[in-house]
């Protein structure tokens, strides 16, 4: 049996709004095996991004347990959380957040340089990952010379170059047209199969969500999980 990459039990998140308390997550239970994929869908303000931030150690739950790779992340210090993120997690956002003054390969190599790899080793690994996302031939181009879909592929390569166990993606195709969005989801499926990386993807698009293995519906702070009808 595969190891659990995510294990959440009775996760609750409450925000204070003046004199009122707003419950965003209510008793969320979630388990994801290494190599599985999950789409999280729900209306605006349903708590999708909040849940993603808790999984990514960027926020903490009010109560309950959230374990990533069997580690209770809330119990780590901020320094330990940063090291944990760098080792185990990759992040993809709606906007690529690439550094515009650097080339594609330099952007992808950045997380490896932060981890302490030599410039040569980081570049080799970055080129290999750009090859996997079909952009090795554009490695020397800066983001301004790339299309929107290409920029997001570079962002995906950057998220995966450290070989994380889990990639968290917040509306990764929200800034793309439908055709390019489908290509990005197909790429995520391909990378999931070839690298055995788990993906949790927040999206508002049910059609795209159905391309992943499981769909989690967040409604009024409660999570319901269903198997996707799509076989990639």
Curated annotation (Swiss-Prot):
Q: How does it sit in the membrane?
A: Peripheral membrane protein
Q: Which GO terms describe its biological process?
A: lipoprotein localization to membrane
Per UniProt, ATP binds at 42-49
The residues covered by the ABC transporter domain are 6-231
Name the Gene Ontology molecular function terms of this record.
ATP binding; ATP hydrolysis activity
Q: Does the keyword Iron apply?
A: no
Classification via SMART domains: AAA
Q: Where in the cell is it found?
A: Cell inner membrane
Query: InterPro entries annotated for this entry?
Result: AAA+_ATPase, ABC_transporter-like_ATP-bd, ABC_transporter-like_CS, LolD_lipo_ATP-bd, MacB-like_ATP-bd, P-loop_NTPase
Q: What's in the keyword line of the UniProt record?
A: ATP-binding, Cell inner membrane, Cell membrane, Membrane, Nucleotide-binding, Translocase, Transport
Spell out the GO cellular component terms annotated for this protein, sorted alphabetically and separated by semicolons. Answer: plasma membrane
Q: What class of enzyme is it?
A: translocase
Q: Kindly give the Pfam families that the UniProt entry links to this protein.
A: ABC_tran
| Primary site of residence | membrane
- Quote the EC number: 7.6.2.-
**Quaternary state and interactors:** The complex is composed of two ATP-binding proteins (LolD) and two transmembrane proteins (LolC and LolE).
Functional description taken from the UniProt entry: Part of the ABC transporter complex LolCDE involved in the translocation of mature outer membrane-directed lipoproteins, from the inner membrane to the periplasmic chaperone, LolA. Responsible for the formation of the LolA-lipoprotein complex in an ATP-dependent manner.
Q: Could you say which protein family the record assigns here?
A: Belongs to the ABC transporter superfamily. Lipoprotein translocase (TC 3.A.1.125) family.
Which NCBIfam families does the UniProt entry name for this protein?
Answer: LolD_lipo_ex
- Its name, as the record gives it, is Lipoprotein-releasing system ATP-binding protein LolD
Name of the gene this protein is made from: lolD
